[in-house]
Amino acid sequence: MKFLDQAKVYVRSGDGGAGSVSFRREKFIEFGGPDGGDGGRGGDVWLEAVDGLNTLIDYRYQQHFKAKTGVHGMGRNMTGAKGADVTLKVPAGTQVFEEDNETLICDLTVVGQRFLLAKGGNGGFGNQHFKTSTNQAPRRANPGLPGEELNIWLRLKLIADAGLVGLPNAGKSTFLAAVTAAKPKIADYPFTTLHPGLGVARIDAREFVIADIPGLIEGAHEGVGIGDRFLGHVERTRVLLHLVSAQEENPGKAYKTVRAELDAYGNGLIEKVEILALSQVDTLDADARRKKVASLKRAAGRAPMLLSAVTGEGVEAVLRALMTVIAEARAEAAPVVETRWEK
């Protein structure tokens, strides 16, 4: 499935149905009064976070959504039915912005959350409402009120517990494939991963979600390479797993490059808990391994974990380190109650 993390959409709720002009007509009742019913309310436009989605690709092919108009009122005081609603289904982690792409309307972070984007117009009054002492047979009814319309931006920030960061070819996709059922594209050239990928890792009977982010290079925050566009997908993570390839000539410099890009991006990424690992250590002999570890330790101020997704060395230790941070963060997270939401 193709990946799309931003889309512009036009939505319009349904107009209200028109009220009816009608009079009671029955045998032996010569002067039946007005009995025109009210129009039905127009359909609403809802946004709902659903399970099983991790892209906004559907909104590349359809950008206009309109709820149905309410049914018109009828005689015998029959009110028209409400117009059918429209529900836009999006992945959890989707933010909705106004047309300026800056003003946040809502943020759907949990599967099952629903938000009312546009409320349907009210139905018009039938002529029964206009009967007075001086006008016993009003021939007047109201049209329904128009629905609301707006242009919105949908922006997806994937929800994962841990985010993989590092330079291209640091072994992020290989690690993701080794510890989850995900099947990312893996090859020996830069930017093999062009879009974020998700996988579920399991350790000690507990599970967490890992996001593989396309590699960063120096100047990514200025648009170099494929830029820092996808860094938004690690904003919601609880911990970063920073992989530095053992094949780097200068692991310390590689580490500092990625940290500088995280800092330049902002939004608190540089402050997130970071697990540091020297990956692809199976490609080194003992002497080379010591030198690379020393270089990385000098740059980071702490010793890295050693990891090889190919041989399995250090994989369980890294997963346990990630799970420890994630479990603590989950315990501290308090549920947030939003009064604007309807379910």
UniProtKB/Swiss-Prot annotation:
Residues annotated as domain Obg: 1-159
All copies of domain OBG-type G, residue ranges: 160-327
Major enzyme class: hydrolase
GO MF terms held by the record: GTP binding; GTPase activity; magnesium ion binding
Stored SUPFAM superfamilies: Obg GTP-binding protein N-terminal domain (SSF82051), P-loop containing nucleoside triphosphate hydrolases (SSF52540)
Secretion signal span: none
Its biological purpose: An essential GTPase which binds GTP, GDP and possibly (p)ppGpp with moderate affinity, with high nucleotide exchange rates and a fairly low GTP hydrolysis rate. Plays a role in control of the cell cycle, stress response, ribosome biogenesis and in those bacteria that undergo differentiation, in morphogenesis control.
PANTHER family: DEVELOPMENTALLY REGULATED GTP-BINDING PROTEIN-RELATED (PTHR11702), MITOCHONDRIAL RIBOSOME-ASSOCIATED GTPASE 2 (PTHR11702:SF31)
Protein name from the UniProt record: GTPase Obg
